[in-house]
């Protein structure tokens, strides 16, 4: 039985109890949310890692993307990025590799990782199609499902599948009323195939086959937003919403068949669209876990897109998004390096933490209360350990320490407001 099937029968597993204890929720409530598709636990039955709960009533989680490209295929560097992502707090990591030995890359990441791993199998299908047939559009239906099963057999915990990029939507896109028709790599690959063959998206047409495969491994399906807006001008348009409605229906089918689902979301959104988008998804998809890329709240933050994404992510999380995909400073520019990964993870963690505070998540509040107490007591060791980047904080304080009183910092010195006010009122 899958997790959903066990939860529907009222069976509370040790895995559920473990997640419930970590999150500070009742196992019975968590199990009910799993049964009804409001929470997922992403762990392939073939992997022995700490289970990751994502969804209603749980801490906001973050994902970091790594992986090779055709321009850079250094597996060791990607493993180092994985270590950095986990060190700074990524709850999950996705391998988005498109260059080099993809199977070797994926298996190395799975072997090396202590956290949930996700992939986008259509990337590998496309790479193999070019190698085998000389063209992406020559890939077959069996090619697609065979690669998905390979990923599942290797132990991948969740996969992005762009089931909502239907033939109807692709035909609608030809009207030309979008600035950026498709910015999803997987979505564009499937749209290209649909147009060439004049056939329906195999992931939509044969969704039952996908569910059968997912059940074998208790593989979580991340229903990808192939029509997500790639710029503010396209935000919350008809293509995005039609796809959301489509994957919402597919999600209901999946839950009824015992398969866990996450819903992926935008993308590029102006701040005043964020609340509406979260509420629409939660309504249409019946509170299924929502996984957002950012969202980026401006198109013009190149080099600083991690900041734009953190602003959007904090707001999205506050309104109910459950899973934030990080964005790095190199977004829209190049393949991220190790420093980009670190900066992206930290920015996303801050956003998720800020959202959890707004949601009233007890452990988030406890951390901030401890920081406030440490500042009151000039407890620098605690302040450093409670920060999101202790190494950086320690280094900054060491580089420019106070000249006289070690309690204060070199910004205010003897004019420290906390020191003066405590002297005055205590």
UniProtKB/Swiss-Prot annotation:
Keywords: 4Fe-4S, Iron, Iron-sulfur, Lyase, Metal-binding, S-adenosyl-L-methionine, Thiamine biosynthesis, Zinc
Chain sites annotated for binding Zn(2+): 268, 332
Binding residue positions for [4Fe-4S] cluster: 409, 412, 416
GO biological process terms, semicolon-separated: thiamine biosynthetic process; thiamine diphosphate biosynthetic process
Binding sites annotated in the UniProt record for substrate: 65, 94, 123, 162, 184-186, 225-228, 264, 291
GO cellular component: cytosol
Protein function: Catalyzes the synthesis of the hydroxymethylpyrimidine phosphate (HMP-P) moiety of thiamine from aminoimidazole ribotide (AIR) in a radical S-adenosyl-L-methionine (SAM)-dependent reaction.
Listed name of the protein: Phosphomethylpyrimidine synthase
């Amino acid at each position: 039985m899958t997790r959903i099937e066990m939860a529907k029968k009222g069976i509370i597993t040790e895995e559920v109890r473990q997640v419930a204890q970590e999150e500070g929720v009742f196992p019975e409530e968590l199990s009910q949310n799993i049964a009804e598709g409001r929470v997922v636990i992403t762990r392939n039955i073939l992997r022995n890692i700490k289970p990751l709960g994502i969804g209603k009533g749980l801490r906001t989680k973050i994902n970091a993307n790594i992986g090779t490209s055709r321009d850079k295929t250094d597996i060791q560097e990607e493993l180092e990025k994985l270590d950095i992502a986990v060190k700074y707090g990524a709850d999950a990591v996705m391998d988005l590799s498109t260059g080099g030995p993809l199977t070797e890359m994926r298996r190395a990441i799975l072997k090396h990782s202590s956290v949930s791993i996700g992939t986008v199998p259509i990337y590998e299908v496309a790479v193999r199609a070019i190698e085998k047939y000389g063209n992406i559009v020559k890939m077959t239906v069996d090619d697609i499902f065979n690669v998905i099963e390979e990923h599942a057999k290797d132990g991948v915990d969740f996969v992005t599948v762009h089931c909502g990029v239907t033939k109807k939507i692709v035909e609608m896109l030809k009207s030309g009323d979008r600035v950026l028709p498709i910015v999803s790599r997987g979505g564009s690959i499937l749209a290209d195939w649909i147009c060439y063959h004049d056939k329906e998206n195999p992931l939509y047409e044969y969704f039952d086959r996908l569910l059968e495969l997912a059940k074998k491994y208790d593989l979580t399906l991340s229903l990808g937003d192939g029509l997500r807006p790639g710029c503010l001008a396209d935000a919350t348009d008809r293509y995005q919403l039609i796809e959301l409605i489509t994957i919402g229906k597919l999600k209901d089918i999946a839950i009824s068949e015992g398969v866990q689902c996450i819903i992926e979301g935008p993308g590029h959104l102006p701040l005043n669209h964020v609340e509406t988008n979260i509420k629409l998804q939660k309504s249409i998809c019946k509170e299924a876990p929502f996984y957002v890329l950012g969202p980026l709240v401006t198109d013009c933050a190149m080099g600083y897109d991690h900041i734009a994404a953190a602003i959007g992510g904090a707001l999205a999380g506050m309104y109910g998004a459950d899973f934030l995909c990080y964005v790095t400073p190199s977004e829209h520019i190049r393949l991220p390096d190790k420093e980009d990964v670190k900066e992206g993870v930290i920015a996303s963690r801050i956003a998720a933490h800020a959202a959890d505070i707004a949601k009233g998540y007890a452990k988030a509040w406890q951390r901030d209360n401890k920081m406030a107490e440490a500042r009151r007591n000039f407890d620098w060791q605690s302040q450093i350990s409670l920060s999101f980047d202790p190494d950086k904080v320690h280094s900054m304080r060491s580089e420019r320490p106070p000249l006289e009183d070690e309690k204060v910092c070199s910004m205010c010195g003897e004019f420290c407001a906390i020191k003066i006010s405590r002297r005055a009122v205590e």
